[in-house]
Amino acid sequence: MLPDDSAAIIGSPGRLFRINIIATVLDLVAEAWKSVRKRSDIDNSSNEDTIAGALYQELWEEWKKRGMDGPPRIENEVASRSSSSRLLPEGFIDFRFVYHWGEQDFFGMECKKVSSTGRTGKYLAEEYVNEGVMRFVTGKYCSGHDVAAMLGFVVDSNIAGSVGLVQSVLFNKQYVAKQSGQWNISKLFGNHSNLYETTHQQYGQAFHMTILHLFQEL
């Protein structure tokens, strides 16, 4: 759940507005993903950046199809810093969905491939947590934000098994990930069958951050 709005939280113009923006983003992703799956240039062997690039193209196509003339503005592979004092980026977040003019007025999403199959599945689950979830927790991505998202590209058609592996890795790292509470089904942002949420205390912040986890079969 989103915490109450606070002046200490970056990118928070209003609770209801943000809920609507995030719900819109997730709906756009779900619809655009159907088009990604139909593309001849994308398959299970495609790397994460290529898949995210295809999704970026299809997101804009879906945005145009709906005749949208307002937020969110969709950005792909954007430099990210944990502090405005840093000259060099600490990473490049896969997506920023911008909803206002301020530097931090966006909803961030990072993408990772996941699988339930053998050593590959375990490795990808660890990457999902270590190079995805932890980038939000440490503030490398979305520093000062109270909500962000992970998008899992399921490459072996087993969503439940892939989710289970991610849960297991995150459970074993819950202290470092500063996780509070359980892995829960998320219901605030629309009816998505494979949408979950976890709650973390971002390093250096007094409030908690909700990380959404959406899984889509490739």
What is the role of each PLM region?
Residues 113-160:
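Catalytic cores of nucleic-acid endonucleases
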Residues 72-107:
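Active-site metal-binding core of divalent-cation-utilizing nuclease and nuclease-like domains
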Residues 72-79, 108-110, 150-154, 212-214:
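Extended hydrophobic secondary-structure segments that form protein cores and membrane-embedded regions
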Residues 169-218:
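Non-catalytic C-terminal interaction segments of nucleic acid-processing enzymes
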